[in-house]
Amino acid sequence: MDIKDENIIEITTELSSEFEVAKELRKYPKDTVIIKNVKGYDLPIISGICNTREKIAKSINCEVSEITQKIIEASDNPIKVDKFTDFSDYNTTEANLDKIPILTHYKRDGGKYITAGVVFARDPETGIQNASIHRMLVLDDKRLVIRIVPRNLYTYFQKAQKLGKDLEIAIAIGMDPAILLASTTSIPIDYNEMDVANAFKNGELTLIKCGDLEVPQADIILEGKISVSETSAEGPFVDLTDTYDIIRDQPIINLSKMHIKKDNPHYHGILSAGFEHKLLQGLPQEPRIFKSVKNAVPTVENVVLTEGGCCWLHAAISINKQTEGDGKNAIMAALSAHPSLKHAVVVDTDVDVFDPQDIEYAIATRVKGDRDLMIVPNVRGSSLDPVAESDGTTTKIGLDATKSLKTLDKFERVSFGE
């Protein structure tokens, strides 16, 4: 795993993978942490490799303010991977999850959860490969239950069900942050996320031939099949809102092989509801929102799903306002692009969308409630929103915190130009 972080915190105290490691990780919300002594296991644990925008930007060689454009560029111009290797650098055995220090995070969790596992599968009809992160609950040493939401892998699974044939998969854990980021991107179903990763890597990405799949050189790779006939209860699990998600009946994964790197392997555990969880789930939605807003307001500068909004429910959008009404058009475009978005605030380019205090300043000095507040009741929202109705509907709010073009001189920020 290639980690570009000079400030790694190493914990040498012996800790249990049940609750104790997670408790320790919560002390370091924005640090990269290695737990070197996990009770009963040989493998150390690493966490926090993607828990700040700065780390993510560094992994794809750009500034924080350029992340959205970098993702758009790589997604629109993927580079087909043409470099491959094998498992000669790995120890290959029969699958045995008891050898991996998989974490139990919180008291009411359904059990031990793999949280940084990227699942690779091929469309049973077209053969196109997909990569996506999924939480997976451990049932025993060879079985997992996977939470599958209605996206690409779900489509593949439905096709496999119709064919009556279990879906072959590989699960990669512990990889280059740029590859991990690529696996979270929202791209068309006929695109391959590893080609996006290859664009991040300037065409230099090497993958492993794993049966019919092509997977990154992760520290741990599991092989198996998603059963089209077996299910089990999945949950509870603490989701990015720091609240428990519900228990659902989900498909079972039956594992066959396990490959662990010979040279210094780590188990990557993402702390549920931590910043790494929030950023990897939310940040890749920002390009989609940006594109939608750009269609309505071509002078959009940036879009941020804020940490206070769990990187999912709240967006801050900066625009170079040209006409009255641009702010509200940006709000409507953002809400339609990301259905889970609950509150959106639009600001001018003299406001730093990465700074919560600056956003609050814009709200305090530029918003007139009866004019600038939009309320949209009875619309579909996020299943993760604790106040959403049982049918998934909620009320959404947009706040136009841009300057009125009629009285620009009143809003000049003296310190901004100094």
Curated annotation (Swiss-Prot):
MF annotations from Gene Ontology: carboxy-lyase activity; metal ion binding
Cofactor names: prenylated FMN; Mn(2+)
Top enzyme class: lyase
Active-site residue numbers: 239 (proton acceptor)
Domain of life: Archaea
Binding site for Mn(2+): 130, 193
Pathway, per record: Isoprenoid biosynthesis; isopentenyl diphosphate biosynthesis via mevalonate pathway
Reaction(s) catalysed by this chain's protein: (2E)-3-methyl-5-phosphooxypent-2-enoate + H(+) = isopentenyl phosphate + CO2
Keywords: Decarboxylase, Flavoprotein, FMN, Isoprene biosynthesis, Lyase, Manganese, Metal-binding
Task performed by this protein: Catalyzes the conversion of trans-anhydromevalonate 5-phosphate (tAHMP) into isopentenyl phosphate. Involved in the archaeal mevalonate (MVA) pathway, which provides fundamental precursors for isoprenoid biosynthesis, such as isopentenyl diphosphate (IPP) and dimethylallyl diphosphate (DMAPP).
Family membership: Belongs to the UbiD family.
Entries under NCBIfam families matching the protein: UbiD family decarboxylase (TIGR00148)
Protein name, per record: Anhydromevalonate phosphate decarboxylase
Organism: Methanobrevibacter smithii
Lineage: Archaea, Methanobacteriati, Methanobacteriota, Methanomada group, Methanobacteria
